[in-house]
Regions:
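A beta-strand edge to alpha-helix "cap/lid" segment located at domain peripheries
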Residues: 48-159, 216-223, 228-292
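Acidic, low-complexity intrinsically disordered regions
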Residues: 23, 43, 97, 124, ...
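Soluble or luminal CAZymes and related metallo-dependent hydrolases
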Residues: 1, 39, 163, 167, ...
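A solvent-exposed, acidic/Ser-Thr-rich amphipathic alpha-helical stretch
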Residues: 14-68, 182-234
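Short, aromatic-enriched amphipathic alpha-helices that serve as compact interaction elements
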Residues: 1-13, 20, 147-179
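A generic secondary-structure micro-motif detector
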Residues: 161, 169, 201-202, 249
């Protein structure tokens, strides 16, 4: 069913996607769930408008496990590359749930350069939704040292190979457990790793180690939690989040960063890694910019 999104973006085909959506289907964009054909037609129209601002649309990687498919799309023009991740949960030819995470800051910057002269609000999109309300707990892992938290093996499908489970567990230990020594085991100099539109691990860019240190340094009392893992032999989508204290002008605020990470791997090494975080949704929800 991921092909319905691809057809919408590449061929401006609204009918195939419309036919696959039920009245009860849920569509997540901008950290807001949309229900029903009226709201969903509006989302399709906005995506069709967005694609006219880019020259190519490419499905860079995808993964499927049972009735769930996910992929990372690359929207490109001469000057800009924007990533977004889509996940479809379907049954009997109908989409039950469609989730999207978009590099909205990069999208807005490129989209607004095409607007009329004088339009300078480059970090906003007029049609981007208001996020759903969110209540955060004050869970502090320092006060619960013996608490057991979900790991890769707890959330990944039981038929996932042991090899994929082991690699993903190593990856989770690096990013959740601040395991800097594990970076060399997972990443090579040839690994493509991007956080939204920022590409790491290349000349003139931060290394993976530098990025991990930056993440740990800017987000205080950082607590990572897995939400879903979809994996096969060569690809995986990890949905996870970080709850943390973020320093702003008026002190500290508790924030949550929902993150979608698409991975491709080979010979126990990660070859491509794409992180997507919705910057506009974060700023709308917490009144502060992303810390990276």
């Amino acid at each position: 069913m991921l092909s319905t999104i691809q057809q919408l973006l590449e061929k401006q085909d609204t009918q195939t996607l419309t036919a696959a959506l039920l009245h009860s289907s849920r569509w997540l964009l901008g950290e807001r769930l949309h229900y029903g054909p009226i709201q969903q037609r509006g989302l399709m129209a906005n995506w069709l408008d967005i694609t006219t601002h880019f020259e190519t649309v490419e499905l860079c990687a995808k993964v499927q496990s049972g009735d769930v498919e996910a992929g990372v799309f690359c929207l490109s023009s001469a000057s800009t590359t924007t990533y977004f991740i889509a996940q479809c949960e379907h049954r009997n030819g109908a989409i039950k749930q469609l989730l999207q995470w978009v590099d909205s800051a990069s999208l807005a910057a490129h989209y607004n350069t095409k607007e009329a002269p004088g339009y300078d609000n480059s970090m906003s999109l007029p049609f981007w939704p208001e996020p759903d309300p969110l209540q955060l707990s004050e869970f502090d892992p320092q006060l619960h040292l013996k608490t057991t938290h979900a790991g890769i093996n707890d959330v990944v499908a039981s038929n996932t190979s042991d090899k994929s489970k082991a690699l993903l567990s190593q990856w989770w230990q690096v990013w959740q457990g601040f395991d800097t020594a594990g970076i060399k085991e997972l990443y090579s100099d040839a690994t493509h790793i991007s956080v939204n539109s920022q590409v790491l691990n290349k000349e003139g860019s931060p290394s993976v180690l530098s990025w991990l240190n930056q993440l740990e340094g800017k987000l205080h009392r950082r607590y990572c939690q897995l939400e879903q893992v979809i994996a096969d032999e060569r690809n995986a989508l990890v949905r996870w989040r970080i709850d943390a204290d973020l320093k702003i002008d008026n002190g500290l605020i508790r924030v949550r960063l929902p993150i979608a990470t698409m991975l491709t791997f080979n010979d126990n090494k990660i070859t491509n890694e794409y992180w997507v975080v919705d910057s506009i949704a974060f700023e709308k929800r917490f009144g502060a910019p992303l810390p990276f």
